[in-house]
Amino acid sequence: MPRIGVMFDRDLSPEDLQAFAAAVEEAGADDLWVVEDLGWAGSISTAALALAATSRIRVGIGIAPVPLRSPALLAMELAMLARVYPGRLVAGLGHGVSEWMRQLGVEPKSKLAMLEETVLAVRGLLRGDLVTVDGREVHLDGVRLVHPPAVQPAIVTGVVRPRSLELSGRVADGTIIAEGNGPAEIQAALTHIRRGGATDEHELILFAYLHVNDDPADAAKVTGAMVEGQASWLGVPPSEVFSLIGPVAEVPGKVRSLVEAGTGTIVLRPLGPDPIPQVRAALSALGR
């Protein structure tokens, strides 16, 4: 069986996070995933609150854009969480949305170099190494953490394009694949990831829209705008956007198809006004 996670959507009220996290844990999920989009909430503080509100589940950051923080600061923040909550943190890193990075004046000259150099520097710092880097984008001169964690968190990347997927296979512990991608896209992504040198231990994490509803017309009213927007981003018709939208009886079969394609963790992103009942229904159908 895969790991089953749940996303705390960026549009939910921050005050609801801890109750949401506790409910997800009680419902039997393996993970809670948080996001970081410009103007919403910071991922490190969100992850800290989620970890504090739970006792068992893994909390994933999906993702922290690497141009926003020095690798040293990022490692310091992650080390603190990993020490206090050993074995319960996954650090997802990515390029960040180019438009947002330009808004903030932090867009790197080389996105690939920025991501690779950050992943390697952060991993070294979390190991307790004395890290010196003079790369294309990252520059550190003899930095070491005073309190490195005993259990190092996995570092995964949320990336899309072939060269970035190969980079993830080369340097990361896993790869996050965005909503709307199904079994065929998973297999295509894995081809690039493995070309980068990924082993069987590389964790493939897929975000998937969830809306349990037996009425297709009603489901379309709730989810249509989100699906259409993602279809536009992916460059496909809305009908080709993979999702867990529909009758709950279809959820196990769709999840099985993702696992057979190579997915190790499926993160449910519930759509609609009542996310927790949606999550409970899906987890129950999956035998949780």
Identify the meaning behind each predicted range.
Residues 1-288:
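Active-site-adjacent structural elements that line small-molecule/cofactor binding pockets in enzymes
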